[in-house]
Amino acid sequence: MEEFKRYLELDRSQQHDFVYPLIFQEYIYALAHDHGLNRSILLENIGYDNKSSLLIVKRLITHLITQMYQQNHFLFSANDSNQNPFLGHNTNLYFQMILEGFAVVVEIPFSLRLRFSLEGKEIVKSQNLRSIHSIFPFLEDKFSHLNYVLDILIPHSIHLEILVQTLRYWVKDASSLYLLRFFLHEYRNWNSLITPKKSSFSFSKRNQRLFLFLYNFHICEYESIFVFLRNQSSHLRSISSGTFLERRYFYEKIEHFVEVFTKDFQAILWFFKDPFIHYVRYQGKSILASKGTSLLMNKWRYYLVNFWQCYFYIWSQPGRIHINQLSKHSLDFLGYLSSVRLNPSMVRSQMLENSFLIGNAIKKFDTIVPIIPMIGSLSKAKFCNVLGHPISKPVWADLSDSDIIDRFGRIYRNLSHYHSGSSKKTSLYRIKYILRLSCARTLARKHKSTVRAFLKRLGSELLEEFFTGEEQVFSLTFPKASSTSRGLYRRRIWYLDIICINDLANHE
């Protein structure tokens, strides 16, 4: 952040969150253009073509402001959807660049304020907490003691004006917010000319950064109220709530919330007194698990629906929240089927001349790979058919043999690495079989041969070295305990370096 601060010269404007001048700086869009900045190598690099020009982006912003003051709310007609004489290039490209530039500008005051709020506080800064797998040890420890879970589909049909209004108490620069509001309005109108069937929240990978930022920030608003109510109802304060930044908007919401619910406030706090309640949000979904009864979970469901509709203007329905009993239902969670199953065990008790067999059942958190959705993902990616039979990948036939093998091997290693937490490894073996045979069929198609003849000529060892399984990697990591490592591999392994989900593992 120091580098950002020096480069963007934020000292003069950060006190009042005056970010309007940054919108006109070309280096902002150069930073947005560079997708390699602070991104994982596992993410797909979607670059722009060489026809993009920062000067045209700056001209487009100036043109936007001119139209804004003239109150002309239709910058482009339907005939100008792809080419525009003013721009001379693809208009969609520059709208995407401006969206990413806005995302960089809007994130700056939040990052600075978060950093300043954490100074002097003893908060552990661990990169391991960013890992997706870091949530599963928590679930292993907590879910085995719980009974019910709410599977919540978070409402996403939020008007863009509400998202901009949420920023007003954070960024007090009215000019930048007015320009952002105007641009989002124009972008939605222009985007509907090209994709009229898409909703305002159906965005491609190139331009979703700003909208995801606004959406996540809006969701964090009501989550912060949950933390506030939880702390008010419990003598044990939540440590994580200290990371929420103090802001006027939050406390105004709290005051309004308490004022409306003056009579029912104590009853509402009763919801949060349950010491065995846990909340997790992920991928537009959230789960709320509790040790309570089904009646309590029903009350939670209707409370959440009314809370979203009345105080955050988000339309929702009770049907979007499902109540599941953990012992009878599996939870589709981050590429895993998670459930709580009973693990029976027998204990022999000896008392003098008599012995007794005592049956005992222990609840255990279990995670497996959903093989049917996984085969569906492989089928959509053209690695196999809908029945799971491997097929060739014709679009890769023009690559070199080493590139083809490396691509297939990398996909399998990523999937095997991500699903290392599965308690049953047989599903991974089937995925390996599909990818290996698909790779062999692709190579045979390229050389106009059969799979049998190709493997007989080059040997199956050619593919084996590229499809190094997680077990071999684990053995290489702990070479002195190879026999022990094989036993450990059969158990669940959670890695703390996974910050994204492979598209094939994401069945959402």
Curated annotation (Swiss-Prot):
Q: Which GO terms describe its biological process?
A: mRNA processing; RNA splicing; tRNA processing
**Which InterPro entries does the record cross-reference, listed alphabetically?**
Domain_X, Maturase_MatK, Maturase_MatK_N
Q: What is its main location?
A: plastid
Q: In terms of domain of life, where is this protein from? A: Eukaryota
Write the record's keywords in alphabetical order, separated by commas. Answer: Chloroplast, mRNA processing, Plastid, RNA-binding, tRNA processing
List the subcellular locations: Plastid, Chloroplast
| Cellular component per GO, a single term | chloroplast
Keyword Chloroplast annotated: yes
Extract the GO molecular function terms from the UniProt entry: RNA binding
HAMAP family with a match to the protein in the record = MatK
Role: Usually encoded in the trnK tRNA gene intron. Probably assists in splicing its own and other chloroplast group II introns.
Q: Which family does it belong to?
A: Belongs to the intron maturase 2 family. MatK subfamily.
Q: What is this protein called?
A: Maturase K
Organism source for this protein? Stewartia pseudocamellia
> Lineage of this protein's species?
Eukaryota, Viridiplantae, Streptophyta, Embryophyta, Tracheophyta
Give the gene name.
matK
